[in-house]
A protein has these predicted regions:
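Zinc-dependent metalloendopeptidases
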Residues: 12-154
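Sec-dependent bacterial lipoprotein signal peptides
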Residues: 1-10
Length: 154
């Protein structure tokens, strides 16, 4: 399953060719992010990913008591695959071969997909395919606001 999905996760498509995901979440609304059989370090990476979005004003992820939830599972992946968002099941899969910082960025990237964002080229973005270093930027926040409105206005 990883190999088939890896082909989707590492390739970029023209946005006009993308099929809307089944599970897209309002990033300004409460959203529980739960580690699936995650250890303490993996849970910390989930919290760090939520904080990365919080640093640019996206406030929803990791609030307790949320009606909606996204799972995060960690495990082995094909070489060169860092993670993917299984929108049919609302689960983010993350390679367990990554460092803590890389895991947080990959989770933040996959949360971007859960918010409805697609891969970005031409500028530094958490939504760059294969990204392991760029955290969510103000431009990424702007992309979220273009889809959902500005969280600060709610």
């Amino acid at each position: 399953m990883w190999i088939v999905l890896a082909l989707v996760s590492v390739g970029c498509s023209d946005a006009s060719e993308l099929v809307p995901p089944e599970h897209v979440f309002d990033p300004c609304a409460p959203l529980a992010i739960a580690g699936v059989d995650a250890n303490a370090a993996e849970l910390a990476s989930i919290a760090d990913a939520s904080q990365l979005w919080g640093d640019v004003g996206i406030s929803g992820p990791l609030e307790t008591g949320a009606g909606d939830s996204v799972g995060v599972a960690f495990g082995a992946a094909a070489p060169g695959v860092f993670g993917f968002y299984d929108d049919a099941a609302a689960i983010i899969h993350v390679s367990d071969a990554l460092t803590a910082g890389q895991r947080a960025i990959v989770i933040a990237h996959e949360l971007g997909h859960a918010f409805g964002l697609v891969h970005v080229t031409g500028r530094g973005s958490v939504m760059n395919a294969g990204n392991l270093t760029i955290v969510p930027t103000d431009e990424d926040r702007g992309d979220v606001a273009a889809l959902w409105g500005d969280c600060a206005d709610r």
